A protein has these predicted regions:
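Core alpha/beta nucleotide-donor-binding catalytic domains of modification enzymes
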Residues: 48-174, 184-187, 193
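RNA-binding accessory domains that recognize and position tRNA/RNA substrates
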Residues: 5, 11, 37-57
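Short, conserved micro-motifs enriched in small and acidic residues
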Residues: 24, 28, 160, 369-377
Length: 402
């Protein structure tokens, strides 16, 4: 530890002393910095972030952090709109592989357990983005956990307390804007108590809260309902003014059709075997006779698919593409799944991928990643409305200054 301290610049040591109270806390602070033996780089990252927040400065792009980032649904959209990502956290090694390949980040991408990470090391930012894990609250996740006798919601020991981790970061960094996403079941989970807890935790910290369930099928050919939560720090945005944020209006026509990205000659491995296709048909018929809606989801070239889940890799039954003639239906290819989830080329080009985001993990991992992701174009449309509120705030600031 002494050797590392001697390696630091005097101004870095002085800065550490200001951030801590005594030698013990200094030691703990420095240990958290050297988890990857890159103390100088980490110090520079944090110190560079301690500047005027860009939501106040029209000449500076807004900054954001990407928590529980997955493969970067938030990252794609906000960068496309001119934002600068200053910190990313994701602990799944396969998602990290995709994320780093797509966005090229090394220094600002962190794969620690965010619950154990020193939150004071997170750079200052304007927008905290988090699609916090939905399995503890989703209908499918709750059903599975109940069948296994496991806890769900906030009682889920592995993932249920990650929302409280977000609140811990809010307490330390106090971002002006929170931009959160989860499954639509969040509001009804545990008879509304889950949503009450979330609302109260955010509200008690002085944020004005806006929430809405939005179906991505307004923009992409997939039925995918998610709740989006946008929060503004009242001490900033409600000071002698009112927040006029509104969620985006739905377009009259989707931006992308299924046929626009279906491959003409996909590999035969994606076509269902006779055995699997017969099984799925018999399974669907059995449940149809019982009056249940369980079964496969067959869709034509210009239809709207069911929701793609992280389980799609198992048999693909939720989204099957019709084929001509005698051929059995087929699964989506990973490339088609990418476009169905809204990771279109306009986002990829922002990061130098002129032919779209490449597949860098196995088919199985790709399906899992897309099934767990947020749809970038929905994030983009909501962020446009957030930017409008930021610009309105800036205008009010300039008006008062004049």
């Amino acid at each position: 530890m002494d050797i590392l301290l001697r390696d630091l610049n005097p101004e870095d040591i002085e800065w550490i002393k200001k951030k801590t109270q005594n030698a013990t806390s200094q030691n703990k602070f420095i240990k958290s910095l050297i988890s990857e033996a890159r103390i100088k780089e980490k110090l520079q990252l944090v110190r560079n972030s301690e500047k005027k927040n860009s939501y106040q400065d029209s000449n500076t792009p807004f900054s954001f952090i990407d928590l529980f980032a997955g493969i970067g649904g938030f990252r794609s959209a906000l960068t496309f709109l001119g934002g600068k990502c200053v910190f990313t956290n994701e602990w799944n090694k396969y998602a990290i592989t995709t994320y780093k390949n797509w966005y090229g980040d090394e220094e600002s991408t962190n794969d620690d357990d965010i619950r154990n990470f020193n939150h004071s090391l997170i750079p200052n930012h304007d927008v905290l983005c988090a699609g916090f894990p939905c399995q503890p609250f989703s209908l499918a996740g709750v059903s599975k956990k109940n069948s296994l006798g496991r806890k769900h919601g906030f009682e889920d020991a592995d993932q249920g307390n990650l929302f409280d981790c977000i609140m811990s970061i809010v307490d330390v960094k106090r971002p002006p804007i929170l931009f959160l996403e989860n499954v639509k079941n969040l509001k009804s989970h545990d008879k509304g108590n889950t949503w009450k807890h979330i609302y109260n935790e955010i509200s008690s910290r002085g944020y004005e809260i806006f929430s809405k369930v939005i179906d991505a099928s307004n923009w992409v050919p997939q039925h995918r309902e998610r709740i989006f939560i946008v929060c503004f720090d009242k001490s900033i945005f409600c000071k002698d003014r009112k927040v006029n944020f509104q969620f985006p209006e739905f377009p009259t026509k989707r931006e992308y059709s299924l046929s626009s990205f279906l491959e003409k000659n996909p590999d035969k491995k994606y076509m269902l075997s006779d055995k699997l296709w017969n099984y799925l048909q018999n399974y669907a018929e059995k449940h149809r006779r019982k009056g249940n809606g369980f079964g496969y989801g067959l869709v034509g070239n210009d239809g709207k698919t069911r929701t793609m889940s992280a389980r799609y890799y198992k048999d693909g039954a939720e989204i099957l593409i019709e084929q001509d003639g005698w051929r059995n239906p087929r699964r989506l290819t990973p490339n088609e799944a990418k476009y169905l989830m809204g990771f279109h080329d306009k986002y990829a080009k922002c990061f130098g991928h002129m032919n779209g985001f490449p597949q860098v993990v196995s088919d199985t991992q790709s399906y899992k990643q897309f099934g767990n992701s947020v749809v970038p174009i929905v994030v983009e449309k909501i962020m446009i409305q957030i930017i409008a509120e930021i610009n309105s705030y800036r205008q009010d600031l300039n008006f008062k200054a004049a």
